Swiss-Prot record:
InterPro entries linked: P-loop_NTPase, RapZ-like, RapZ-like_N, RapZ_C
Family of the protein in this entry: Belongs to the RapZ-like family.
Chain residues that bind ATP: 10-17
Binding, GTP: 59-62
GO molecular function (one): ATP binding
Pfam families: PapZ_C (PF22740), RapZ-like_N (PF03668)
Function per UniProt: Displays ATPase and GTPase activities.
Name listed for the protein in its UniProt record: Nucleotide-binding protein Dtpsy_0831
Organism field: Acidovorax ebreus (strain TPSY)
Keywords: ATP-binding, GTP-binding, Nucleotide-binding
């Protein structure tokens, strides 16, 4: 079946509508809040009308039917449909702030209870429990530090690569700002020599030639690159065979400016051609 389906789920307030707008801009036929029990019939109907790219968003308001989604997606894959799953998430404090700023109520906050509306943190905890099976199957996007324009850009980048191959997302980050929630693998490179302590390199980044030359001369850096690359070489085929569309490899150093950026650039270059690759520098790009 010549059809690609993108299913967007995630926490309320995480940016699902923004992600859906990105897909609409990219030419997908989009439906928001589709009841899960209608997913298969909707996809088949759209294909009958010669549609080739479809995107649907689902949220916790359809909680009773959400357990049907994994089985339906498996059935679509058996028919030859290219299925991609995105799960948008953010830290609880960010979600609370967004609800406060927009003055919107959480979809589960008005569930009928004798003691009245549920507290926001309680409903968020319940929502995470209900959505956990879908999160496990999807590519997670942590929107905690993303502006709407950055989320739009990132989703478009993800969907710009062919769905038939595994996509590797290499991301640099600063440990002092926290580990991103969307990482599948996290490598700590803070033990490597730090260009920050070289006065002429401090203001530069891991993409600048002087920093690249400095790090290339460090045996520990070369060894770390080899070990991470060999680990990925060993396991990526198995991940691809397990219907994984995306794998996010996060490389962290103290400031997210020199060492992690350099390693991300080198690893992405190593795997380009064999796999789809994307590069994200969280601290440099403001994401």
């Amino acid at each position: 079946m010549d059809l690609e389906v993108v299913v967007i789920t995630g926490m309320s307030g995480s940016g699902k509508s923004v992600a859906l707008h990105a897909l609409e801009d990219a030419g997908y036929y989009c439906v928001d809040n589709l009841p899960p029990e209608l997913l298969t019939s909707f996809v088949e109907l759209e294909h009958a009308h010669h549609g080739h790219r479809v995107a649907v968003a689902m949220d916790v308001r359809s909680a009773t039917a959400l357990p049907l989604v994994p089985q339906q997606l498996a059935g679509l894959r058996e028919q030859g449909v290219q299925v991609r799953q995105l799960f948008l998430d953010a830290t609880n404090d960010v979600l609370v702030r967004r609800f406060s700023e927009t003055r919107r109520r959480h979809p589960l906050s008005q569930a009928e209870m004798r003691e009245g509306p549920r507290p926001l943190l309680h409903t968020m905890r319940l929502e995470r429990e209900l959505l956990a099976p879908l999160r496990e199957q999807a590519h997670v996007i942590d929107t905690s530090t993303l502006r709407s324009s950055q989320l739009l850009s990132y989703v478009k980048d993800l969907l710009s690569v062919p769905p038939s191959r595994l996509t590797l997302v290499f991301q640099s980050f600063a440990f002092k700002r926290g580990i991103s929630m969307d990482a599948d693998y996290v490598f700590d490179v803070r033990m490597l020599p730090n260009p920050h302590y070289e006065p002429l390199l401090r203001a530069l980044t891991g993409k600048d030639a002087p920093v690249i030359d400095y790090l290339r001369q460090q045996p520990e850096v070369a060894l770390m690159l080899a070990h991470i690359g060999d680990f990925l070489d060993h396991w990526l085929d198995a991940l691809a065979h397990n219907h994984r569309s995306y794998v996010t490899v996060a490389i962290g150093c103290t400031g997210g400016q020199h060492r992690s950026v350099y390693l991300v650039e080198q690893l992405a270059a190593r795997f380009e051609g064999r796999w789809n690759t994307l590069r994200r520098h969280r601290e440099l790009d403001g994401i």
